């Protein structure tokens, strides 16, 4: 079975945060919740120090520690390697957030919007089931599944590719 992976060429990343913005827009995450973020790090030693940018999100681990600590089995791994959360089963204990070595899980207690009231794209994509439960990068599984169902190729066809990659 295919196992999805995301590879970023760090030599080409300029830290523009476009991946972060496109993920936030596609998933209508509330302020402060970044399923995809870009770390700004220093590489080398003085006087030859360079800046590097590293996009980070859920790594959809081969053996996810978040899945093993979940008391309700809300965190699951699909056969294709994508780690998902069943919001109906999640009790919001946040054990998974503590277990995640990439700090890629968030828990939002209440609905918050960038400008107090939801913008058009926020209301359309706002999911009330994601309140008081753990959330994380979904690898845009809805886009991948819909694309595969219509014969599109993830990574080639934008409609079938995670938003942060486009």
Regions of interest found by a model, annotated:
Residues 1-166:
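Non-ligating segments of multi-cofactor redox enzymes
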């Amino acid at each position: 079975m295919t196992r999805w992976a995301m590879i970023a060429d760090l030599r080409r990343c300029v830290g523009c945060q476009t991946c972060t913005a496109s993920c936030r827009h596609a998933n209508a995450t509330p302020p402060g919740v970044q399923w995809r973020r870009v770390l700004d790090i220093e590489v080398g030693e003085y006087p030859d120090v360079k800046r590097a940018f590293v996009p980070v999100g859920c790594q959809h681990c081969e053996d996810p520690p978040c899945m093993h600590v979940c008391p309700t089995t809300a965190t699951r791994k699909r056969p294709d390697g994508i780690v998902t959360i069943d919001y109906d089963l999640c009790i919001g204990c946040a054990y998974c957030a503590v277990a995640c070595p990439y700090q890629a899980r968030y828990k939002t207690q209440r609905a918050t919007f960038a400008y107090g009231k939801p913008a058009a794209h926020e209301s359309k994509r706002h999911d009330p089931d994601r309140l008081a439960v753990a959330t994380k990068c979904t690898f845009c599984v809805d886009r991948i599944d819909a694309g595969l169902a219509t014969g599109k190729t993830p990574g080639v066809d934008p409609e079938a590719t995670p938003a942060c990659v486009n």
